[in-house]
Amino acid sequence: MRVGIEAIAFHGPEHYVELTDLAKARGVDPDKYTKGLGQIRMAVATPMEDTVTLAVNAARKVLNNFDIDCHDIGTLVVGTESGVDHSKPVAVYVHDALGLRANCHTYETKHACFGAMAAVFSANDWISCGRADGAKALIIASDIARYPIGDPGEPTQGAGAVAMVISDRPHLLQFDPEVRGHYTKQVMDFWRPLYSPTAFVDGHYSIGCYLNALEGALVDALDKAMFPERYAMERLQACIYHVPFAKMAAKAHHRHFEIDADEMIDAESKRYVEVRQSFSEKTQRWLSLNAAVGNIYTGSLFLSLIDLLRGSTSDDLKQISMFSYGSGCAASMSIAYPTPGFERFRQAIDPELELNARRKLSISEYENIM
């Protein structure tokens, strides 16, 4: 059975901040944000926008844009780390707003930024094992990344939701049922206690945890593959990653390349040029949406996927890798195959018009919202 993504859509806040403006306000060289982090803008959620409203709007877009009947949804899962209640899931509010059927299996998943990918895997397995009986799964990644004013994490904020419909009619992308690697380890790289409205993060440590998890998940995936050589980097036309900030994808791809090559490669290495070229061809091209929106936690990998699908054709995109990471930590590496002809859905996928219609906030307006 072919199972994967039938439809996908993004919805974000109506306002944003220019990172160059934020840098000047904080007395920082703008290059630190725009080149060091690779970020251009960050979406800012107002008090009228929360995880629920972002999720509902993304869900409405994916159903409307792809002409999917809400009564065909048999499972609804929201992956988030910025829920609105310690007990009641965001998903049940979305269920009500969309008017989904009463026997729709509905719940929320949480594992930092890995929550939505966990939901995608669950939906994929639900359909693959025959329990769906023709129904589809609606998976939504919805989050608001927020840090205190002046905090080192401030320029890595963002907000938004990505909604996906998983079904046995994967018009956009099919998941490889054989290759799915996992990695889990208890680490304190990022957390948000119940008493705090903002997160705590050890940035440098978290980068190391991310890269260790990438290696663990990739090695596990290859160990499970009957023919691991089929998943070598040279056979991948695109490699997309969890993107807390755009430059993290460069670090991730570098490590991915090293594991594939079975050698460490630094800036003095003869193969360093190959690493940079590989990143440019397989990853960097699909980071413009992340750079314009910021960190949306559970949805950041899928925002990069939207960028990939809107800017590619099935002639030059046959096999891709997808790495998901959630602090704390959990990670997965999976392989997927874009469906031939997926480009006919480009207009339904592309959020460019919405992003261009956003209103720029002054720093004082932004600080008042915070």
Predicted regions and their residues:
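Condensing-enzyme catalytic core mediating Claisen C-C bond formation in acyl metabolism
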Residues: M1-M48, D151-V219, I335-M370
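Conserved beta-ketoacyl condensing-enzyme motif
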Residues: I5, T51-M117, P228-F257
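Acidic, glycine-rich active-site loops and adjacent beta-strand->loop/helix elements
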Residues: A9-H11, G79-D85, H111-A116, A141-R146, ...
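Short, well-ordered amphipathic alpha-helical segments that serve as non-catalytic structural scaffolds
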Residues: D29, T51-F66, V90, C209-M226, ...
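Conserved catalytic cysteine-centered active-site region
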Residues: K32-G36, I40-V52, E81-K136, S142, ...
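A conserved active-site cap/scaffold subdomain adjacent to cofactor or substrate pockets
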Residues: H204-E258, L289-N290, G294
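Hard-cation-handling environments
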Residues: Y241, I259-D262, E274-K282, D307-L317
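Catalytic phosphate/nucleotide-handling subdomain of diverse soluble enzymes
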Residues: I306-N356
